[in-house]
Curated annotation (Swiss-Prot):
Keywords: Methylation, Ribonucleoprotein, Ribosomal protein, RNA-binding, rRNA-binding. InterPro entries: Ribosomal_uL3, Ribosomal_uL3_bac/org-type, Ribosomal_uL3_CS, Transl_B-barrel_sf. The keyword Ubl conjugation does not apply. HAMAP family: Ribosomal_uL3_B (MF_01325_B). Methylated by PrmB. This is Large ribosomal subunit protein uL3. Part of the 50S ribosomal subunit. Forms a cluster with proteins L14 and L19. GO terms for biological process: translation. GO terms for molecular function: rRNA binding; structural constituent of ribosome.
């Protein structure tokens, strides 16, 4: 298992196969990501590498974080994430990782935060039918109806579908096929859609259920 990469969702486009078939793709700017630290099974109890993405002003970081980057001899980064790996010794602190590690026709898992919708009612959030439009209905047209029983159990059950904040949740889409790789600009195109809005942060790993391309 090798390290994934941190990136930004650039938006969606389309590509055409040799036989003229059109496929929707999502463009992702991956890296360059610098290896800031390594975690080993002997010292930390697990194997991983810590990657930094997008350079940041040192003044915007705490003294502790600046010291961490100075120790690794890496310019300060805005985003810091860890990826589990099989062999951390195959990575060097300060090494730059780019999109060229992914190959066309390989499969990846993409993790991102879904588009936030704000406070939403039960009809939009959960697809409830709502109340009656007429025939005695009074201000219950988009209501969720009853939320429980009476004195027994005397409470609302956990995970009851109700109105609330919709979206802005971490989700992973698995087994997306890599349709194109631009090693120079460190951009990949994956078939289909991925979570998040344009410009949102995403994590791209080798597909867990398809096996690594190593």
């Amino acid at each position: 298992m090798r390290s994934g990469l941190i990136g930004r969702k650039l938006g969606m486009s389309q590509m055409f196969t040799e036989d003229g078939q059109r496929i929707p793709v999502t463009l992702v700017q991956l890296g360059p990501c610098a290896v800031v630290a390594k975690r080993s099974d002997e010292q930390d109890g697990y194997n991983a590498v810590q990657l930094g993405f997008e350079e940041a002003k040192p003044s915007r970081l705490s003294k502790t974080v600046r010291g961490q980057y100075a120790k690794a001899n890496v310019t300060p980064r805005r985003v810091l994430r860890e990826f589990r790996v099989s062999n951390p010794e195959s990575y060097e602190v300060g090494q730059e990782l780019t999109a060229e590690q992914f190959a066309v026709d390989s499969f990846v898992d993409v993790t991102g935060k879904t588009v936030g919708k704000g406070f939403a009612g039960v009809m939009k959030r959960w697809g409830f039918r709502g109340g009656r439009a007429s025939h005695g209905a009074h201000k219950v047209h988009r209501s969720g109806g009853s939320i429980g029983q009476c004195q027994t159990p005397g409470r609302v059950y956990k995970n009851k579908k109700m109105a609330g904040h919709m979206g802005q949740q971490t989700r992973t889409v698995q087994n997306l096929k890599v349709a194109y790789v631009d090693a120079v600009q460190s951009i990949i195109a994956v078939k289909g859609s991925i979570p998040g809005s344009k410009g949102s942060l995403v994590l791209v790993r080798d597909a867990l259920k398809k096996g690594s391309a190593e």
